[in-house]
Amino acid sequence: MSVENLKEALPEYAKDLKLNLGSITRTTELNEEQLWGTLLASAAATRNTQVLTEIGAEAADTLSAEAYHAALGAASVMAMNNVFYRGRGFLDGKYDDLRAGLRMNIIGNPGVEKANFELWCFAVSAINGCPDCVASHEHTLREAGVSRETIQEALKAAAIISGVAQAIVASQTLATAG
C-alpha cells in the first residue's frame, strides 16, 4: 500500500493529479513529519477509504506513533470545528459572543511540535472549506515563524490529496455503473 498504488489507481484524465502526487512527496519545503502528517490528515479529511488506507500505510512507516495519531487527531477535531465555525460564520456575527463549548484539548496538547499540528489543521480546514479556520491557523503558523512557502506547500498537498480522492471516487463509481 502506497502513494504508488494511488497513482496507479488514477484514471488517465487525472494525469495531472498523478504527476502532482509524485511531486509533492518529493517536496523540500516540508520536513518529513510535516509532509506525511499533512498527507495523512488530508487523506482522513477526504473520507475516501482507498486514499486513507494507502496514505495511512505509508505514513505509518514514516511518522512516529505520536505524529501519526496527532495527524488523525487534527483531521478529527477539524471535522468538528470546521462545521461549527463555518456554520457560525454564516450567521453574520450573531453568535460570535457565545462560547463554543466544544472540547478541543488536542489543539493545546497535540503530542507533537505545535506548528506541525497547526499545519495539519490548516490543511484539513482548507479541504473542509472553513475560511475562518484557514485564516486562524495560517495566522498562528505565521506567528510561530512558519514561512509562507511552507504554508503554501501544505495547502498544495491538501489540494492534491482532495483531487486524488475525488478522481478515484468518480472512476470507481462510473466503473460500477457502466
UniProtKB/Swiss-Prot annotation:
InterPro entries membership: AhpD, AhpD-like, AhpD_core, CMD-like
Keyword Oxidoreductase in annotation: yes
Enzyme Commission number(s): 1.11.1.28
Keywords (A to Z) from UniProt: Antioxidant, Disulfide bond, Oxidoreductase, Peroxidase, Redox-active center
Domain of life, source organism: Bacteria
PANTHER family on file: ALKYL HYDROPEROXIDE REDUCTASE AHPD (PTHR33930:SF7)
Name of the protein: Alkyl hydroperoxide reductase AhpD
Gene that encodes it: ahpD
